[in-house]
Amino acid sequence: MNRFFESLINLFFPPKCPFCGKILDTVGICPKCERSLPWVPEEEVAFTEKDLTCAAPLWYEGAVREALLRLKFRGGSALAEPFGELLARCAAERFGGEFDTVTWVPVSQKRLEARGYDQSRLLAEAVCRHWDTRPVQLLNKVQDNPAQSG
């Protein structure tokens, strides 16, 4: 998006901190929330199985949990940008920052129609904007599984 349109959008819909709602100059997290978030220490890995290692920037609790639930279930699609930045930074710091492909696990057609967006795809796109690349759709949802949370 060019800077003019981005500035125009920010004039009418200014970026807000996803945790406290404070209006910001740019998309991101306010300094107060940045300091108080439940960060996962770099030396802690969330999951390791054979050659697969997963990591997360934040623990899923409190304000983080609430913001992610807004993103997923309550029309908070704008939250994908700040969370995408966090994911991009975490992956670059913990895994070296060079990746062959970024993809996502899509939602079912039923959930896509109900929400109006695929939060996983939005997160993948936001991560890729920080790495100047594009996500690649590698997976298709063939079955509508029961919701894991809500």
PLM segments and residue spans:
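Glycine-rich phosphate/pyrophosphate-handling loop used in enzymes and phosphotransfer proteins
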Residues: 1-150
